[in-house]
Amino acid sequence: MIGSASDSSSKLGRLRFLSETAAIKVSPLILGEVSYDGARSDFLKSMNKNRAFELLDTFYEAGGNFIDAANNCQNEQSEEWIGEWIQSRRLRDQIVIATKFIKSDKKYKAGESNTANYCGNHKRSLHVSVRDSLRKLQTDWIDILYVHWWDYMSSIEEFMDSLHILVQQGKVLYLGVSDTPAWVVSAANYYATSYGKTPFSIYQGKWNVLNRDFERDIIPMARHFGMALAPWDVMGGGRFQSKKAMEERRKNGEGIRSFVGASEQTDAEIKISEALAKIAEEHGTESVTAIAIAYVRSKAKNFFPSVEGGKIEDLKENIKALSIDLTPDNIKYLESIVPFDIGFPNNFIVLNSLTQKYGTNNV
C-alpha cells in the first residue's frame, strides 16, 4: 500500500501556494511528462508501465503531489498511465494534475485528410483535447490546463473566452501557458482581467543555467502578473553530466538521448557541467543535476522546476536539490562560465534600473 505524502519529512512534501492568482498548494518540484515514456523510446528514455508506477509512487511517498502531462505526449501514453496510476492508488483528491492542449497525435494516426481541427488554439481543438484528456486521466477535472504553445493563427479573444468557459464548467480549475512569447501572454492576461475572464496563473518554458533566454521577458512578465514559473529542461535534457558520469556512460555503451537524438556534449555543455560539478563538490554531493535544479530555484520565488527522472535513483538525487542553498558566489561563478547577453533594450538604457530593482542575480 502506498504511503501518505503528507507524512513525509522530505522537503518535497513542504507544499507551497502556486502563485498570487492560484492558491492551490503544490510540491516545489514537478514530476515531468517525459518520465512516462514507453511509446517514444526511439529518442526518449524507455520506461514500461511498472517502472513508471514505481517512479510515481516514489515521488508521491517523498511528498510530491504536482504531476505534469500533455495530450499528445508519448502517443498519448503519458495521460493514460497517470490516470491508471491515480485510480489504482485512489489518489485523485491528493494529486495536482497539469496537462496541455494544442497538438494531437490523432492527426498522425488518422492521416492527413480531415484532421486539421485536431490541432491549434481554436475552440474545436480545445474541446476535443480536453474531452479526451479527461477520459485518459480518468477524472472529472484538470487542475491546471496549459496552452502548449501559441499557434499564431487563433485570436487571443477566442482562446481566452474558450478557456474561461471550461473553468466555469468546472472541467478546469486553473490556466497555464507554455512556450509562448511574453507579449502574447501579456495581451491574453490583460484581456482576461479586463473582461472578467480567467487569466493564466503559471508559465512553463525552457530555462537552465546554460540557456537563460527566459530571463529577458518571461520572468519580468510573470512578476508583473503574479504568475508562477515552471521551467523545463532545467537539467539540460540530460546533457549536464560530470566527466565521471560521461565516462561511465561510454563504458556502459549509453549515449545521451534527447529530442535531437543521441550525441556527445557540446563544448558549452562540458564547461557548464564541470562548473556544476565543482559547486556540487563544495556542497558535498556528486550530483550536477541537483546543483542545476538548485540554481534555478535560487533565482526567484514561485519557481517550480520540472524534473524528468527516468530512474528512481535519479529522482531521489533531484529531490536532494531542495536541501541545497547556493551562495551568491556560487551563482556568480556559474553565470560566468557561459556569459549571457540579456539583449536590447535591457542591456541599454534600462539595465541599470533593472539591476537596482531586482538585483544582479535576477536581471
Swiss-Prot record:
Its EC number is 1.1.1.-. The keyword Oxidoreductase applies. GO terms for biological process: aldehyde metabolic process. GO terms for molecular function: aryl-alcohol dehydrogenase (NADP+) activity. This is Putative aryl-alcohol dehydrogenase AAD3. It comes from the Eukaryota. It holds the Pfam family Aldo_ket_red. Belongs to the aldo/keto reductase family. Aldo/keto reductase 2 subfamily. Keywords: Oxidoreductase.
